[in-house]
Amino acid sequence: MNKKLYSLLSVFLMTIVMAAPVSAGGAVKLSGVSFRLGSLIADGTLSGLGNADVSVVIDASGIPAITCVNFGGNEVPGQSYPKVAASGTQFLDGDSPVRKNGKSPFGVETVDPETIPWDEAGCPSSNWIGHIAFIFWEDATISVYDASTQALLLQREYDCKTTLTSVSCTPK
């Protein structure tokens, strides 16, 4: 009797353990990733998606170039450079005609903050607001989620180097 119970329990546990990687999307792969400016834009290709709907999320952080502006329109440089964060999402439909054999291109872009509170920006007083003119990106993370279950299928982190004209990000 105990042998049967242990056998059934073992089969049940093996079924759960074997099914977990399948539902977690362990076969999803990211390739050909390149980054460019606009905000921070990541383009690439995902494979191993099957026909599942997925969301591609980019989370990034960096140091802003800040100009303090008062209500009269006067401008002075900000005296502080706190790290700021931005993110963006792209939905990839499993029935999209661009998806072939479980493979899909993507292009996801951050939605950047435009302003920062005066005291964080190093502006002279509360009559000023910090306007973010540009962000020197330092870090980025691309995550892929199953749209129906929100399960994380893939995550890749990058170190970024930014100039006023270009950005280069390499996997950590």
Spans of features found by a protein language model:
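Generic N-terminal leader/processing signal
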Residues: M1-N2, I16, A27
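Mature extracytoplasmic or otherwise solvent-exposed domains
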Residues: A24-K172
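Bacterial N-terminal signal peptides
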Residues: S10-V17
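N-terminal signal peptide c-region/cleavage motif recognized by signal peptidases
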Residues: A19-P21
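Bacterial N-terminal signal peptides that target proteins for export
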Residues: M1-L9
